[in-house]
């Protein structure tokens, strides 16, 4: 059984801030969002957690191993260095989507994301212990993306094909299994999953092929932290690439960096 700790990171009152006292320059906003995500990623990475940019004003992190004090330290650091603050809600559940729902509710019960009086909420449940089977992470990519798309199409049409595959994949995993999937650049998607057998991943790859005619491959890893499970998934994906298989499950967590 998996046990996933998910943290929602929400910029407080961000929409109104972007247009007060007048609309801010778009590239300034994009730079702010990118820097904030990079700083949060640098905070999470050494602690073996993952964070995904999602919509940038709302980021989703897999934080197994991080306690309330670590979350408070992140919140304080952002408040000291940025013109915006963040609220953090954390939930724990077997299915990642249920953990996220719990995290969302914690913030929503405190008020609207655009309520100027609702700032720096810090709430949630945190795992007190971790186990090697707590997390299952799958790393997908497109088979021969360079030969099929990058070297043949213009970049925007390549991007559209990747987006089609991502949309089909993420909806299927969300609706069928309560997994959370995130585009992480290039042709890569990382999915945080409940306890799924190999056949479920084969079915997922087949669904995307049938739905949008794009061939995926996936490596799957387990671990006590997002890094541990994700790194095992990377190694399993390399086995797919080397052996020409569509699904590979890591036998044991990859502990190196």
From Swiss-Prot:
Keywords: GTP-binding, Hydrolase, Nucleotide-binding. GO terms for molecular function: GTP binding; GTP cyclohydrolase IIa activity. Its EC number is 3.5.4.29. It catalyses: GTP + 3 H2O = 2-amino-5-formylamino-6-(5-phospho-D-ribosylamino)pyrimidin-4(3H)-one + 2 phosphate + 2 H(+). Disulfide bonds: none annotated. It comes from the Archaea. It holds the Pfam family GCH_III. Coiled coil: none annotated. GO terms for biological process: biosynthetic process. Belongs to the archaeal-type GTP cyclohydrolase family. This is GTP cyclohydrolase III. It comes from Halorubrum lacusprofundi (strain ATCC 49239 / DSM 5036 / JCM 8891 / ACAM 34).
């Amino acid at each position: 059984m998996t046990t996933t700790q998910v943290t929602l990171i929400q910029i407080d009152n961000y929409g109104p801030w972007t247009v007060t006292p007048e609309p801010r320059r778009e590239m300034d906003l994009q730079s702010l969002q990118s820097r904030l995500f990079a700083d949060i990623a640098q905070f999470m990475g050494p602690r073996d957690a993952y964070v995904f940019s999602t919509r940038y004003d709302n980021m989703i992190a897999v934080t197994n191993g991080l306690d309330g004090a670590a979350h408070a330290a992140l919140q304080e650091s952002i408040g000291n260095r940025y013109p915006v603050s963040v609220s953090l809600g954390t939930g724990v559940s077997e299915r990642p989507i249920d953990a996220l729902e719990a995290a969302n509710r914690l913030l929503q019960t405190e008020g609207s994301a655009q309520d100027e009086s609702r700032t720096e909420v810090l709430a949630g449940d945190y795992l007190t212990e971790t186990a090697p089977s707590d997390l299952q992470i799958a790393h997908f990519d497109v088979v021969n993306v360079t030969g099929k798309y990058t070297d043949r199409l213009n970049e925007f049409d390549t991007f559209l094909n990747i987006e089609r595959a991502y949309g089909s994949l993420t909806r299927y995993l969300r609706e069928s299994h309560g997994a959370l999937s995130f585009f992480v650049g290039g042709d890569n998607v990382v999915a945080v999953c409940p306890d799924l057998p190999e056949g479920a991943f084969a079915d997922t790859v087949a669904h995307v092929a049938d739905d949008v005619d794009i061939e995926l491959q996936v490596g799957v890893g387990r671990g006590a932290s997002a890094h541990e499970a994700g790194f095992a998934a990377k190694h399993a994906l390399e086995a797919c690439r080397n052996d020409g298989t569509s699904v590979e499950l890591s036998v044991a967590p990859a502990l190196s960096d």
